[in-house]
A protein has these predicted regions:
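Core catalytic alpha/beta fold that binds nucleotide/phospho-ligands
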Residues: 2-120
Length: 120
C-alpha cells in the first residue's frame, strides 16, 4: 500500500478569472504564448467568455506542476479534451512516466484545477 502512495502526487490550483479578463488576448498575445500552446489558445478563443477557459487551463497546468516531482514548464504541458473530460499531454520524455486524472471547474470569478499524477 505504501508503494502505491509513493507513486502518487496531487496538485491543486485556484485562480481568479479576472486575471485573464484584464489581459485580453488581442492586446497580450506574447503573455499567452508563454503559457499556452497554439491548440489551447484556439480552443479558448472559441468561447464567448474565453477568460474562464484560459483560467481553467492555467489552473490545470499549475496543478500538474505541483503534482509531479520533476521540473516542467507551462509549454511542456498541453490540456486537451476527450469528450467533456480534460486530459494532459506532456511535450517531453515525461509523458511516458506519468498517468493523470484531471478535474477543472470554472465559474464567473474563479477557476480551479485538480490533478492526480501516477508515476508509472
Amino acid at each position: 500500500m505504501l508503494e502505491m502512495i509513493e507513486n502518487l502526487g496531487i496538485g491543486i490550483d485556484i485562480i481568479e478569472v479576472s486575471r485573464f479578463r484584464r489581459k485580453k488576448y488581442e492586446e497580450n498575445r506574447n503573455f499567452y504564448k508563454k503559457i499556452f500552446v497554439k491548440s489551447e489558445i484556439n480552443y479558448c478563443l472559441k468561447f464567448k467568455n474565453s477568460a474562464e477557459r484560459f483560467a481553467g487551463k492555467f489552473a490545470i497546468k499549475e496543478a500538474v506542476i505541483k503534482s509531479i516531482s520533476e521540473k516542467i514548464g507551462f509549454l511542456d504541458i498541453e490540456t486537451v479534451y476527450v469528450g467533456r473530460k480534460p486530459r494532459i499531454r506532456l511535450k517531453n520524455s515525461l509523458e511516458k512516466k506519468y498517468n493523470f486524472i484531471v478535474s477543472v471547474s470554472h465559474e464567473k470569478e474563479f477557476a480551479i484545477g485538480i490533478v492526480i499524477a501516477e508515476k508509472i
